[in-house]
Amino acid sequence: MKKPLLLIIALTATCTVSAQGYYTDAHNPDITRHTGRIAPQRMEFVLPEVNGYTAYKADLHTHTIYSDGDCTPEFRVREAWYDGLDVLAITDHVEYRRHEGKMLHFLKGYVPEGTEAFNNNVIRKTADERGIQSDLNLSVKLAQETAVKYGITIIPGAEITREPLAYGHYNALFTADNNALYDVDALQSLRNAKAQGALVMHNHPGWRRKSLEHPEFEVKAYSEGLIDGIEIMNGAEFYPKAIARAHTRKLFVSANTDIHDSAAETYRIQGHRRNMTLIFARDNSPEALREAIEAHRTLAYSFDTIAGDEQLMKDLFAASVKTKVLYTDPKNGQHTVSLTNNTSVQYVLRFPGQNPVVLKPFSAITTTVGRDKPLRFTVENMWHSEKDHPRIEVNL
């Protein structure tokens, strides 16, 4: 009798759970809706204030259907908000717009018969005398119109895109008119960007190359002072040698998605946070963000790794992780110390003579420190050069 009774109880519990999984629609009692279908929610990425500045999460390299991306500018904004971003640069290619032919075919009733796309792929060849007739400002405008509903700041931009081995790709940020960027001479395109007040970022410097050594074009671009920043990380690629270049040439550092598909496909479904450029600014206005970028108050974040200026990373860590003496052994004076991580960043710590330990977001670990000794460790998922990580010392 006991087994049938247990079965009845189990079935009753199952039915109860199933019943609780639905609710009656507030406007139509003939509809029941499942509680599992909830409103989309933003995944916050919590960071502390550092030296009085707010840490804004930015993606400075994204694409839409108006170049070779698979998503609209409006979707890019919503996606960024759900991913916890505060700042988004729309940087469609100037020289490559692979959807234009399909767009014209779709609009065949609106355009003269036989109208074909032209100069929509001039990465490896020059545009003819007709030039580029598409409105390269449209994707930025559409993103800006949507962004006001989400509190996201849009940085207008475009990617100057030439053959990757000899020339490379460069994002012009804070542009005034993307339609005025193109020139047959790639160097002149960079000059055009600078002339309208844009900051120029060197994108994925190792992409499709055998090293980060400068080809002749880059030597000229850097020597002329046309480059303001560099991607330390792009997608899943990390260029440790680029950190030293940023220090030497006084460039801001960044990490970006270079997203073409959806961020859910590339990051969320695989359990990752998307790449971010952390900008430490007084507020989220374009002026304040630009001031912070020009002052090099940026760090690169990708796949739980942070890279950039050593002192800024130390300041971020100090603001993120709090230490506390939990117990002092009265016999030998040895301290038991807790380290509490109050942020969304995961830290990999190595104490002297030990294997690395992971301090997860919003978690704490303990370690021991001898009498009258400081707490010392290295943060191994922070990089301030090709091989070096910040060394932290805390006096207890």
Whereabouts are the PLM-identified features?
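His/acidic metal-ligating clusters that form di-metal
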Residues: 199, 205, 213-216
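A metal-dependent hydrolase metal-coordination microenvironment
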Residues: 36-196, 203, 232-233, 237-243, ...
